Amino acid sequence: MRIAVDALGGDNAPQEIVAGALAAARRLPGVEILLVGEPGAVEPLLERAPGNVSLRPSGGAVRMDEEPAAALRSRPDASVAVAARLVRSGEADALFSAGNTGAAVAASLLYIGRIGGCRRPAIATVLPFSHPTLLLDVGATVSCRAQDLLNFAILGSVFARRYLETEGAPRVGLLNVGEEPGKGHDLAREAHRLLAASPQVEFAGNVEGRDLGSGRADVVVTDGFTGNAVLKTAEGVARECLRLVREALLGSLAGRVAALAARPRLLAVRDRVDPENYGGSFLLGVRGAVVIGHGNSTARGVENALAGIARAGGGLVAELEATLARQRAASGREGA
């Protein structure tokens, strides 16, 4: 597998991005890493690069404050655009970027393109509960149709089998305001009908926000606006809970003694919810394995993201296309 890495994308680029890519290259000797970036910024960091790392020159990064489409039109040599074109040409099989999320999505749609039968892509992220749950969409498609949510469920099911290594068919839930089939707005009710009728989906029914980590569903689908709000809320609540625990334990001598005794378990909890364990979120629905990293990704997060691509990305697009085609055949639909 060959992975194009946007070496200039992210708050800690290029140092942390390159360091993580080099660590992944050593960990995965059968994977070729194509670092994409300005030679003057990247080459000095490659003195000890293993043989499966190479540099592909590009212009600068798309900044976080830039409008993605306008930036790509005005600067087609931007690092994320060059990386996406490597996937389109077949020189790379996958793309990783920790830069501007909108730019990564736009470059993927513009240069790589959507897979057959998929009108809109979805960003899928793993919620690190005691029962890890795949949530999609978390930001690629803010406004959805019911058919899009069905497609997300199919994409997520295929991906969860590979990435989460679920036993049997992953159970899919529809994020809603209640468990009953008639709950929610028109979109939710129509999506519920389509999901319940699909032979490609093991539908578990509606799932409320409080049940995301309960194990009722392995995959939960929603529109990108709601999914992004859920993700950011979960991240904020996790940080606040850790802060409150730390404050309570360190506020007294007895608490500090207890904290010292519990330190290994507290660190294990902190590490469990650390997004660096996964390193990024897959953009499903495009003709390549695309992973969007966190803007503040460190070398550890980049390494884990590239390892995730190597584990789940091989043959992913072909399987997604085949599964969507079976759904279209079963429903009598032609491509969206």
From Swiss-Prot:
E.C. designation(s): 2.3.1.274
SUPFAM superfamilies, per database record: Isocitrate/Isopropylmalate dehydrogenase-like
A single GO BP: fatty acid biosynthetic process
GO MF, one example: phosphate:acyl-[acyl carrier protein] acyltransferase activity
Keywords: Cytoplasm, Lipid biosynthesis, Lipid metabolism, Phospholipid biosynthesis, Phospholipid metabolism, Transferase
Gene3D superfamilies (alphabetical): Isopropylmalate Dehydrogenase
Coiled-coil stretches noted in the UniProt entry, renumbered to this chain: none
Cellular localization per UniProt: Cytoplasm
Principal subcellular localization: cytoplasm
GO cellular component, one term: cytoplasm
Catalytic activity from the UniProt record: a fatty acyl-[ACP] + phosphate = an acyl phosphate + holo-[ACP]
Pfam families: FA_synthesis
Pathway entry: Lipid metabolism; phospholipid metabolism
Enzyme class: transferase
PANTHER family cross-referenced by the UniProt entry: FATTY ACID/PHOSPHOLIPID SYNTHESIS PROTEIN PLSX, PHOSPHATE ACYLTRANSFERASE
Role played: Catalyzes the reversible formation of acyl-phosphate (acyl-PO(4)) from acyl-[acyl-carrier-protein] (acyl-ACP). This enzyme utilizes acyl-ACP as fatty acyl donor, but not acyl-CoA.
Complex formation: Homodimer. Probably interacts with PlsY.
Family matches, as HAMAP family: PlsX
Sequence similarity: Belongs to the PlsX family.
Designated name of the protein: Phosphate acyltransferase
The organism of origin for this protein: Rubrobacter xylanophilus (strain DSM 9941 / JCM 11954 / NBRC 16129 / PRD-1)
Name of the gene: plsX
